[in-house]
């Protein structure tokens, strides 16, 4: 997921702002590997509902001790690799945990996507 907060489109994931972001689709039991890359100028604490993120690498280097994270703080220029065990069927929100990066008065926008886990 390329995270960006600058430019003409504002807060975006992979160059798109919600609702135009593409969901990640996985079958129940799959392992999903996601690479966070913060190309913007602000920190983005990335949060997935319904499942843990296992942080396995930072800036391209495997971690000697991977760890579970509810939120992964991705600072400008940082890169993280996470694994998610897609073991909970449903549609799960995946978003920046800074409220004004993902939500406003008329609903969700910006740094929001979903993980869809099929049975």
Which residues make up each language-model segment?
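Copper-binding active sites and cupredoxin-like electron-transfer domains
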Residues: 1-119
